[in-house]
């Protein structure tokens, strides 16, 4: 089981996290922007973990986890339209839970201020990698990107997650795809942190995905169930998604 950790020298948060990991685990470092990387730039691995900054208009301190991909024709931030990378729900959720656990310890010890810890929905490149891919990010401004403690939290969480994956030291739970809600997937983040599910792909309300993309979501991830944020999903999308799940033998549930 090979994990490739990827960092960019052009990304302050990426360098911060990598500096706290390199003593314990090899990191693939590049002078390219992370979002410009393709499969040809990376050696083969069973899992790809990108160490990255997160940017937002609100500039709210945050620690986030998500799989990359373009759910619609919009490929403003690179990659191919309507293409997603493979995803592992266990990997994504263990990362989120470990980040939350370690952040909470640092916060209670007075080592770090308030940060939001959450999933993000599927977005941005790269889209063409052939193994499960995930971004772990520090946001949302330079102040947080270079914060030593934030880098330590992500680094520690990545290493703990790799150890758990390699030893299969994790509970068996339903692996789910989530549909609906906003960019930071609050409902699915909460359910994951409550140990209810392992979440992989998360599709927001604002992305009305096609059948082609739906097929990718169930073929590029091991899926046990689809969960629909009932109040956070458009009516016509709910109908289409449910019809697709039932036609493809995917159990679904409203939450």
UniProtKB/Swiss-Prot annotation:
HAMAP family for this protein: Deacylase_DtdA
Coiled coil: none
Cofactor binding remark: Binds 2 Zn(2+) ions per subunit.
Source organism phylogeny: Archaea, Methanobacteriati, Methanobacteriota, Methanomada group, Methanococci
Oligomer status and interactors: Monomer.
Cofactor annotation: Zn(2+)
Catalysed conversion reaction: a D-aminoacyl-tRNA + H2O = a tRNA + a D-alpha-amino acid + H(+); glycyl-tRNA(Ala) + H2O = tRNA(Ala) + glycine + H(+)
One GO term (biological process): D-amino acid catabolic process
The keyword Zinc is assigned to this record: yes
GO molecular function: D-aminoacyl-tRNA deacylase activity; zinc ion binding
Keywords: Hydrolase, Metal-binding, Zinc
EC number: 3.1.1.96
Protein name per its UniProtKB record: D-aminoacyl-tRNA deacylase
Protein role: D-aminoacyl-tRNA deacylase with broad substrate specificity. By recycling D-aminoacyl-tRNA to D-amino acids and free tRNA molecules, this enzyme counteracts the toxicity associated with the formation of D-aminoacyl-tRNA entities in vivo.
Keyword flag Hydrolase: yes
Membership in a protein family: Belongs to the DtdA deacylase family.
InterPro entries membership: Deacylase_DtdA_archaea, DtdA
